[in-house]
């Protein structure tokens, strides 16, 4: 079992926690991590690109010249693709880029990135993050006590609204609930701060 220190909000050690090696100490699978990141990034695309084909371009209802006798190539509309200002052939249309990978593959990717953070010493476990009211300065003070000063992902309980609101104005800090933890955000974070109860919930869902 991998052991990590459980810190208080003031930075002192409260206890020691044994992590489940099946979740936090596996051999990372880089191929599956890549698949999961690409899936999430593809799902984030708006896919609103569009151009007009010949039926969508305005004008061109009149035949530009008669069919025969002019020596020119026949044409039925000045909005045909070969004309300047004409429609586009096989251009991009709005579509969704979202796709899914297997649930087990995604879970393996999540366990892989969590294991990487533990191996690199970038996981910080806190016994609790409690604030009397939403206040950014209080949240910054806690991060300073935990020696966290880089791009950070903080994972808290579902009902910890004060912590979520306190971090909204911090540019390098992202706070999410346990159910929202995902591969892309864990990969992008330099530090991972997780509340102890969330660690137990993550292990219960992935072990």
Curated annotation (Swiss-Prot):
Keywords on record: Ribonucleoprotein, Ribosomal protein, RNA-binding, rRNA-binding
GO cellular component labels: ribonucleoprotein complex; ribosome
Q: Which GO terms describe its biological process?
A: translation
Read off the Pfam families from this record.
Ribosomal_L4
Q: Which residues form a coiled coil?
A: none
Q: Which domain of life is it from?
A: Bacteria
GO MF term list: rRNA binding; structural constituent of ribosome
Q: Where is this region: Disordered?
A: 48-75
The record ties this protein, via HAMAP family, to: Ribosomal_uL4_B
Q: Family, per the entry? A: Belongs to the universal ribosomal protein uL4 family.
How does it associate, per the subunit comment?
Part of the 50S ribosomal subunit.
- What's this chain's function? One of the primary rRNA binding proteins, this protein initially binds near the 5'-end of the 23S rRNA. It is important during the early stages of 50S assembly. It makes multiple contacts with different domains of the 23S rRNA in the assembled 50S subunit and ribosome. Forms part of the polypeptide exit tunnel.
This chain belongs to the protein called: Large ribosomal subunit protein uL4
Which organism is the protein's source? Leuconostoc citreum (strain KM20)
Q: Which gene encodes it?
A: rplD
């Amino acid at each position: 079992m991998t052991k990590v220190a459980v810190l208080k909000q003031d930075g002192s050690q409260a206890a020691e926690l044994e992590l489940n090696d099946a979740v936090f100490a596996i051999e990372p699978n880089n191929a599956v991590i890549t698949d999961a990141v690409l899936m999430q990034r593809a799902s984030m695309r708006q896919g609103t690109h569009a151009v007009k084909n010949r039926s969508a371009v305005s004008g061109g209802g009149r035949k530009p010249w008669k069919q025969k006798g002019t020596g020119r190539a026949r044409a039925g509309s000045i909005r045909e693709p070969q004309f300047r200002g004409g429609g586009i052939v096989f251009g991009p249309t709005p579509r969704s880029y979202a796709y899914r990978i297997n649930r087990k593959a995604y879970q393996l990717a999540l366990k892989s990135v969590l294991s990487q953070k533990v191996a690199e010493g970038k996981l910080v476990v806190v016994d609790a993050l409690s604030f009397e009211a939403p206040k950014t300065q209080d949240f910054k003070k806690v991060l300073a006590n935990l020696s966290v000063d880089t791009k950070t992902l903080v994972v808290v309980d579902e009902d910890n609204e004060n912590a979520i609101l306190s971090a909204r104005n911090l540019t390098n800090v992202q706070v999410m609930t346990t159910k929202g933890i995902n591969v892309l955000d864990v990969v992008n974070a330099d530090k991972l701060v997780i509340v102890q109860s969330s660690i137990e919930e993550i292990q219960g869902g992935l072990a």
